[in-house]
Regions:
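Glycine-rich beta-solenoid repeat tracts in large extracellular/virion proteins
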Residues: 355, 362-367, 380-385, 401-406, ...
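Short beta-strand/loop motif that positions the catalytic acidic residue
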Residues: 266, 272-274, 278
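Acidic catalytic loop of the alpha/beta-hydrolase fold
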Residues: 254, 277-281
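Alpha/beta-hydrolase fold catalytic core
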Residues: 2-3, 12, 21-76, 99-100, ...
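Active-site loop/oxyanion-hole signature of alpha/beta-hydrolase fold enzymes
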Residues: 104-144
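Conserved HGGG/HGGXW glycine-rich cap/lid loop of the alpha/beta-hydrolase fold
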Residues: 67-112
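Hydrophobic, aromatic-rich cap/lid helix
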Residues: 231-259
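Flexible "cap/lid" loop of the alpha/beta hydrolase fold
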Residues: 158, 167-200
């Protein structure tokens, strides 16, 4: 049952205060939001009704709201981390509710829903969404997710593919392997753990873990001596003690989850929107999703950070309505990448900095260079030696070795490499995300010990066939 938002006593019967229409935007966005949108107007939307229900999966209460014509196609909005909850979508809600039946909610642990120390994991949130939406709109709907909500939307579309007609994702958090994600998410998400470690001491933490799980592990190389993160997350006592807010629990669960298998199962056409200045969720994630999701389109919002709905509500509303209203056979829904085209042009960088490569090449050699970027390249072979290189959205199809990396540090995103050997690494550090490696002899050959991080990567060779999402050190002579 969804209660009409109105007299406070109707909700006090359930033991909680009546939710307010007025939300609280992040402080950096308040001026923009106040200038363009009155949150109190949400209550006056046609078909608006809201209230609290018994929260499936988690227990307690969950705030759920609907707006717009009930006989119109449904749009479900899934918010990200932060206690604003569904209020983050308020600036775009009037535009959506004019044409669509909109369902939004505060996920358990956030906003006006019950806060606790439950396991706020992606899988449990997906079950919650399935139950809540199923009670209100059985059948296919359009699914929109922001930040953590974007990751939940992906997992939902993979888990219940018949439910989702289209996806729209904004600044998706998570997805990358936790080591690749560490610089901008891991430490922020575990701020409380570090504080507790400094207060109670590592011995006390180890004692609690030993009692709960009979084992201890370091937090990989990030925080030597810290508790194992999965034990911390899944043990009720440790979770309540050290992860003392739903945001921290949900953030840690998000970082530790592996969304690669889900991404491979998503079939819904997808638009991806990203704020140019997002310091929380890397654009690299958007490139991975664009490359690995079928019929996906990627758009940058130049004036936005992590919350485009707040900083550019008019632009986001326009893009949302454009996407939702497109015919199923529109080229923006069915577009496929162009085929690899041969070229006789060769590219070379030697002892230089800041060089950029784009377009078609027979081969590219990078020797002793720093700050080199390859973007939208199609080539027959690439050699990187003693260099610092970023490679994005690149295809290499070789007769011998597609990509050879020697004594270098390379970040590779949304690329395809194929050849007798797809990747040959010697004494290098390579961070791969959304990369497919296809080798007739080997997908990966290690000529010298190398460190590699794999996020949502594919490997196809006579030696191995499958999915890579791990951080490993590979010894000389390894073939995969």
């Amino acid at each position: 049952m969804c209660l009409r938002l109105g007299p406070a006593h109707a909700l006090l019967v359930l033991g909680i205060a009546a939710p307010s229409c007025r939300g609280t935007a992040p402080q950096a966005e308040v001026a923009t939001l106040a200038a363009e949108f009155d949150p109190d107007a949400i209550c006056a939307l046609p078909g608006y009704r809201a209230g609290v229900v018994n929260a499936p999966v988690f227990g307690g209460e969950a705030f759920v709201m609907e707006a717009g014509p009930t006989d119109a196609p449904t749009v479900v909005l899934v918010h990200g981390l932060g206690d604003s909850g569904a209020r983050d979508f308020y600036p775009v809600l009037p535009s959506l509710a004019a044409l669509y039946h909109v369902v939004a909610f505060d996920l358990p642990g956030f906003g006006r829903s019950t806060h606790g120390h439950e396991l706020y994991s992606p899988a449990r949130y997906v079950e919650f969404i399935h139950a809540v939406v199923g009670q209100r709109r059985p059948g296919p709907f359009n699914l929109v997710g922001h930040s953590m909500g974007g990751a939940l939307a992906l997992l939902y579309a993979a888990s219940f593919p018949m439910d989702v007609s289209r996806l729209l994702l904004l600044d998706v958090a998570g997805i990358l392997h936790q080591k690749a994600y560490a610089n901008f998410a891991l430490f922020a998400g575990l701020e409380s753990v570090l504080g507790v470690l400094g207060t109670v001491g590592k011995d006390a933490v180890r004692a609690l873990i030993a009692e709960a799980s009979r084992e201890t592990q370091p937090l990989q190389p990030f925080i030597p001596g810290a508790p194992d993160l999965r034990v911390l997350l899944h043990n009720d006592l440790l979770r309540a003690t050290f992860l003392d807010s739903p945001s921290r629990i949900a953030a840690l669960a998000l970082i530790l989850d592996d969304f690669g298998p889900a991404i491979a199962q998503v079939r819904a056409p997808t638009w991806i929107l990203w704020g140019r200045h997002d310091a929380i969720a890397s654009q690299r994630t958007g490139l991975v999703l664009q490359a690995r999701l079928p019929h996906a389109q990627f758009y940058i919002l130049e004036a936005s950070g992590h919350d485009p709905m707040l900083s550019e509500p008019a632009a986001v509303s326009q893009l949302m309505l454009r996407w939702l209203g497109m015919p199923a056979d529109h080229p923006a829904v069915t577009a496929a990448p162009p085929p690899l085209a041969p070229s006789a042009r060769a590219g070379r960088c030697e002892n230089e900095s800041g060089i950029r490569f784009t377009g078609d090449y027979s081969q590219i050699e990078i020797v002793g260079c720093r700050g080199v970027r390859l973007k939208d390249v199609r080539a027959a072979a690439i050699l990187v030696r003693n260099s610092d290189v970023v490679i994005e959205n690149t295809q290499v199809s070789a007769q011998a070795t597609a990509l050879q990396v020697v004594g270098s540090r390379v970040e590779i995103t949304a690329c395809d490499f194929s050849g007798a050997v797809a990747l040959d690494s010697e004494g290098s550090e390579i961070d791969l995300a959304g990369v497919n490696l296809r080798g007739q002899r080997a997908g990966i050959h290690v000529s010298g010990s190398s460190q590699m991080i794999f996020s949502v990567c594919g490997l196809d060779s006579p030696l191995n066939h499958g999915y890579l999402h791990d951080a490993v050190e590979l010894n000389v002579g390894t073939d995969l």
